[in-house]
Amino acid sequence: MLVQNICSTKAYNMLILNNNAFLVDVRTQEEWKQVGIPHLDNKNKVIFLSLQLNKNFEDNFLSIINEKIDTAIFFLCRSGYRSFIAANFIANIGYKNCYNISDGFEGNNQDKGWKQNNLPWQF
């Protein structure tokens, strides 16, 4: 299955409704510290796994998310580009329900993003 692009508000609603879904934030540690991170009531649903210069991304991902290949996994970065790469990478190893949050955490040229859409976040 191809990666599905969805906006942050739709992703948030799907994450809240699906207890088995995960959010994978692929931004850098500096971004997490300086800009903030998404907040979900179920802390186990948010995984912080930087994509940048991480040749072990696949192994790290599999060691953290040892779930069925049909688990819904949402990928987030600043504006939707790196998360799209990560989502495609994971889809190509067999995961069937990969979603790219296309407006990212901070937004892009077209959409506001997680933070500006007033979805839960924290420092």
UniProtKB/Swiss-Prot annotation:
Domain of life of the native organism: Bacteria
Disulfide bond sites: none
Domain Rhodanese: 17-117
Pfam families membership: Rhodanese
InterPro entries with a match to the protein in the record: Rhodanese-like_dom, Rhodanese-like_dom_sf, STR4-like
Official protein name in the record: Uncharacterized protein RP600
